[in-house]
Amino acid sequence: YEEMVEFMEKNLLSVAYKIISSIEQKEESRICEGILRLLDSHLIPSSTAAESKSAQDIAAAELAPTHPIRDSTLIMQLLR
């Protein structure tokens, strides 16, 4: 009986962890998409330096959309 209770507790904790992780990932994804939309709609079109636009084009073409370096590359080029 004790083993069954322990197994059920571990199973419930595992399920709860998976649910919470999924919720956090969805929230992070939504926030990142909002930031990328802001970059695409306001900051990138208004940048005047050719290097910033060139870096954005290269990052968009060569890096996967979920690649963490892509976001930091865009932000660093816009801040210059």
From Swiss-Prot:
Gene3D superfamilies: 14-3-3 domain (1.20.190.20). It comes from the Eukaryota. InterPro entries: 14-3-3_dom_sf, 14-3-3_domain. Transmembrane segments: none annotated. Belongs to the 14-3-3 family. This is 14-3-3-like protein 1.
